[in-house]
Amino acid sequence: MGSRAVLLLKGPSPPKHSILFLLNHKKISPAPSIRRFTTKATANGSSLEPPDVARLAETARISLTPQQVEEFGPKIRQVIDWHALLSVDLDSVEPSIRADTEGDNLRHDNPETFENREAIIAAVPNYEDPYVKVPKVLNKE
């Protein structure tokens, strides 16, 4: 008592309407019954129709109130869209930890001695050798 779903696609790109055949194998009938479903593209980018929550509940043999049917519809749509996102092939995308991956864009920091040290010390309001004292920037309370 199981079901198998086969998605048939024609051509290299996915069509606007794809055809899904559901084969129901039952012990009672010798030949499997075939039901045909078509899927349509929707405005939100998903290629599947909105879920029929009432039919899903009947198939799962659970009872839902009309409010629960309305509540679970968008949630089931999110799960379907998430699984569609997981099927995206990312093998051709190189892994990265940040957007800037072109290498070392910073100059080398080479220490240099400033020639006119006394002019800087004269311009600073508070100086204690060898430090320049500045007012606190962060107030820690």
Swiss-Prot record:
Annotated GO biological process: glutaminyl-tRNAGln biosynthesis via transamidation; mitochondrial translation; regulation of translational fidelity
Catalytic activity annotation: L-glutamyl-tRNA(Gln) + L-glutamine + ATP + H2O = L-glutaminyl-tRNA(Gln) + L-glutamate + ADP + phosphate + H(+)
SUPFAM superfamilies the record matches: Glu-tRNAGln amidotransferase C subunit (SSF141000)
EC number: 6.3.5.-
Keywords: ATP-binding, Chloroplast, Ligase, Mitochondrion, Nucleotide-binding, Plastid, Protein biosynthesis
Presence of keyword Disulfide bond: no
GO cellular component: chloroplast; glutamyl-tRNA(Gln) amidotransferase complex; mitochondrion
Compartments where located: Mitochondrion; Plastid, Chloroplast
Protein name: Glutamyl-tRNA(Gln) amidotransferase subunit C, chloroplastic/mitochondrial
Lineage, opening ranks: Eukaryota, Viridiplantae, Streptophyta, Embryophyta, Tracheophyta
Name of the gene: GATC
